[in-house]
């Protein structure tokens, strides 16, 4: 074994080659010059260190297994020289073991040329790698003490600090460059996408504007065509163009209603008025000339006035009916007994005739006054209410013949009471009509409903009847 080692060393000296260490890796590293402390002036520092380490006599064969100990930073498990002696005591020195360890010296030639990966390994992490490349078994590494391990770690960290920093900077710069280039590429693609989106939006806006212009132009053409068609169709219907505009609503209206609406602007029937109003409202936006606008406004005003008149009559009727009912209720409760003598003084000649008839009634039937006042008031109120309804609401004028027939059927006492109460009620209603005529604007609807003239006619008829009855009584007395 010693001869084999000596032969290798002699060949290395002759060829100036050190096969016991990774010479190619260490020589290429830039930190090797700064990290080396023990180096002679000669260029072959490996052999000097090798001769120094091989000077130990008894353990020469074991020291040849690790001839790469030129400095402390090359091996992470390097400790004091005493530690190597302790390690070698436990290892078995045999020929096949030495041959396997010598074969391991050729393996570092395949390892990559960057030594930073080995320097960055943690303490104790290169145990399996050192077994393959450096030939130190796992059993021998466990013998190292903790103090020796810490000391070797501190030396390795001090020697390889600059090399590790430089290696980290060298490795981070290219990776950062790759990341920045990828980011720049993605940024450029995003900008291109945004530009494409903006161009699409502008194209769509231009397209919408073009479509709107086409729509307005076609709408104008359609309006002109409708006017032309209406001008061609007007002579067939014998109606002027200004009274009617061509529209789909107008097409749905029958020909009869169209001619009626064109010929008669305002119809009395309530069914044709809504049709005419709807036709005018639809054609109001499509007027041809200002004359049409004026005519349509006049028609609208006339229709509004007709609607007001239609609503004013029922309101007046309801108002009058309410007042009559209230008056009759007051009469039944004897609220206006104190005012019963006033109408007779104001009437003049009709009251004198009624007084004469009342005096004759007192002379002929003295027992009739013995009736209860409640029965007389109820009967008078009922008959006056019926007469008011007939005269005011229904507008029926009683003829003299019918009055004569009803007077013949009734008793003379009952007849005189009825005539007397009818005169009083008609006089009160006429006074109310005069008060409403002279009152505020709330009685305008009552003035439109002509009830006073009807009651005056009824009073004239009643006066003639009373005159005839007075003459009859005088003839009987004679």
From Swiss-Prot:
Q: Does the keyword Phosphoprotein apply?
A: yes
Q: State one Pfam family annotation.
A: TDA11
- Please give the InterPro entries that the UniProt record associates with this protein: Tda11 (IPR031388)
Q: Which residues carry this modification: Phosphothreonine?
A: 239
Q: Which residues form a coiled coil?
A: 182-219
Name of the protein in question: Topoisomerase I damage affected protein 11
Which family does the record claim for this protein? Belongs to the TDA11 family.
Cellular compartments per GO CC: cytoplasm
Q: Which residues form the signal peptide?
A: none
Its domain of life reads Eukaryota
Locate the Phosphoserine modifications and list their residues: 247, 289
Q: Which UniProt keywords apply?
A: Coiled coil, Cytoplasm, Phosphoprotein
Amino acid composition bias (Polar residues), ranges on this chain = 260-290, 335-362, 371-380
Residues annotated as region Disordered?
Answer: 32-62, 255-309, 335-380, 403-478
Chief location of this protein within or outside the cell: cytoplasm
Q: Where in the cell is it found?
A: Cytoplasm
Residue ranges, compositional bias (Basic and acidic residues):
293-304, 406-424
């Amino acid at each position: 074994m010693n001869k084999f080692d000596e032969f290798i060393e002699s060949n290395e000296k002759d060829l100036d080659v050190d096969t016991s260490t990774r010479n190619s890796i260490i020589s290429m590293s830039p930190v090797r010059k700064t990290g080396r402390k023990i180096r002679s002036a000669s260029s072959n520092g490996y052999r000097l260190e090798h001769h120094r380490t091989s000077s130990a006599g008894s353990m020469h064969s074991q020291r040849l297994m690790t001839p790469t100990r030129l400095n402390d930073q090359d091996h992470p498990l390097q400790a004091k020289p005493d530690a190597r002696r302790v390690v070698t005591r436990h290892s078995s020195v045999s020929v096949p073991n030495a041959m396997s360890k010598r074969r391991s010296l050729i393996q570092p030639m395949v390892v990559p040329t960057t030594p930073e990966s080995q320097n960055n390994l943690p303490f104790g992490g290169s145990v399996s790698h050192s077994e393959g490349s450096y030939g130190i078994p796992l059993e021998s590494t466990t013998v190292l003490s903790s103090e020796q391990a810490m000391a070797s770690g501190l030396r390795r960290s001090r020697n390889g600090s600059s090399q590790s920093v430089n290696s980290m900077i060298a490795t981070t710069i290219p990776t950062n460059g790759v990341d920045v280039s990828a980011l720049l590429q993605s940024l450029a693609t995003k900008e291109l996408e945004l530009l494409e989106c903006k161009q699409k939006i502008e194209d769509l806006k231009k397209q919408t504007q073009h479509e709107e212009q086409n729509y307005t132009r076609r709408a104008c053409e359609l309006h002109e065509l409708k006017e032309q068609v209406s001008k061609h169709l007007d002579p067939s219907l014998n109606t002027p163009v200004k009274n009617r505009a061509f529209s789909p609503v107008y097409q749905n209206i029958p020909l009869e209603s169209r001619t009626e609406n064109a010929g008669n602007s305002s119809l009395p029937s309530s069914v044709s008025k809504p049709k005419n109003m709807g036709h005018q409202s639809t054609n109001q936006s499509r007027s041809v000339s200002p004359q049409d606008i004026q005519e349509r406004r006049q028609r609208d005003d006339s229709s509004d006035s007709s609607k007001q008149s239609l609503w004013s009559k029922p309101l007046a009727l309801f108002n009058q009916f309410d007042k009559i009912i209230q008056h009759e209720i007051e009469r039944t409760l004897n609220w206006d007994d104190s005012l019963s003598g006033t109408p007779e003084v104001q009437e003049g000649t009709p009251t004198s005739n009624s007084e004469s008839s009342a005096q004759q009634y007192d002379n002929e039937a003295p027992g009739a006054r013995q009736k209860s006042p409640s029965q007389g008031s109820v009967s008078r109120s009922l008959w006056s209410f019926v007469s008011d309804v007939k005269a005011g609401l229904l507008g029926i004028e009683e003829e003299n013949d019918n009055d004569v027939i009803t007077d013949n059927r009734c008793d003379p006492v009952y007849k005189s009471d009825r005539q007397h109460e009818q005169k009083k009620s008609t006089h009160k209603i006429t006074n109310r009509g005069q008060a409403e005529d002279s009152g505020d604007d709330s009685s305008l609807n009552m003035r439109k409903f002509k009830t006073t003239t009807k009651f005056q006619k009824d009073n004239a008829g009643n006066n003639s009847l009373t005159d005839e009855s007075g003459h009859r009584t005088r003839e009987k007395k004679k």
